[in-house]
Regions:
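N-terminal hydrophobic targeting signals that begin at the initiator methionine
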Residues: 1-3
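A short amphipathic helical element positioned immediately N-terminal to and/or at the very start
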Residues: 5-14
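Generic structural signal for small/hydrophobic residues in well-ordered secondary structure
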Residues: 13-16, 23, 44, 58-64, ...
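Short, strongly hydrophobic transmembrane alpha-helices
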Residues: 16-49
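Membrane-proximal extracellular/periplasmic loop immediately following the first transmembrane helix
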Residues: 37-105
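Short acidic/polar micro-motifs at solvent-exposed secondary-structure junctions
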Residues: 62-75, 97-125, 135-149, 172-180, ...
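Mid-to-C-terminal secondary-structure elements
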Residues: 123-135, 149-206
Length: 206
């Protein structure tokens, strides 16, 4: 019975070749487009899903101009004292971290010099709030002291090769010369994370 249905369907397709080809191609294109869109949506919705819930980002509304009717823009910025102040005044806030970023950050280790696309200066609480994987070192206290650094696997490979970088120093030559002690190694940041960095430096260094 089913075999006959297939025969009839095949005959109809063969009899109306052009019409059938248009339908089949249209169906194939539609299904392919649907799959691509669903994959894109799933990827976008996966961003930062590996982090613990109840994380909130403070934004700042800036007014462009002096008039109260001047246009406003919302930016992901806040004053550095805001975190400690809010924590002190609102017991509901369990923790906070500040992020100050820099890009094309030059780092030197002996005779090796590299430019890191993105680095963060963060509070020691950064890895208590965000669930980035620490492979080696103390993720909870590794950024507590000034001039401490935690670097990704990729950065460690570029600077130290196969050697253990824990306890070794790296130096930034910029407006000021700053030396950091490596206290930990982190897994490379997943692509589906909004926070992309190659190294974390102690906020207390600033």
């Amino acid at each position: 019975m089913i075999k006959n249905y297939f025969k009839i369907a095949w005959r109809n397709i063969w009899k109306n070749k052009v019409f059938s080809a248009i339908n089949i191609i249209g169906l194939a294109v539609g299904m392919a487009a649907f799959m691509v869109i669903m994959m894109f949506v799933a990827y976008e919705k996966s961003f930062d899903n590996f982090h613990t819930k109840n994380i909130y980002r403070l934004n700042e509304v800036q007014t462009i101009g002096q008039d109260e009717n001047s246009p406003k823009q919302k930016v992901a910025l806040s004053m550095f004292p805001m975190g400690p102040t809010l924590r002190a005044e609102f017991p509901e806030i369990k923790n906070f971290t500040r992020i100050n970023w820099d890009n094309k950050y030059q780092i030197t280790q002996k005779d090796k010099k590299i430019f890191l696309p993105q680095v963060f200066f963060v509070d020691s609480t950064f890895l208590k709030i965000f669930d980035f994987k620490v492979i080696k070192g103390d993720g909870l206290n590794g950024l507590l002291k000034p001039h401490s650094a935690m670097i990704t696997e990729e950065t460690a490979k570029k600077l130290f090769g196969d050697a253990d970088p824990i306890g070794k120093t790296i130096t930034h030559y910029g407006r000021d010369t700053t030396t950091f002690a490596v206290t930990g190694i982190m897994a490379n940041v997943p692509k589906n994370s909004q926070l992309q960095f190659d190294a974390l430096f102690s906020f207390n260094t600033i």
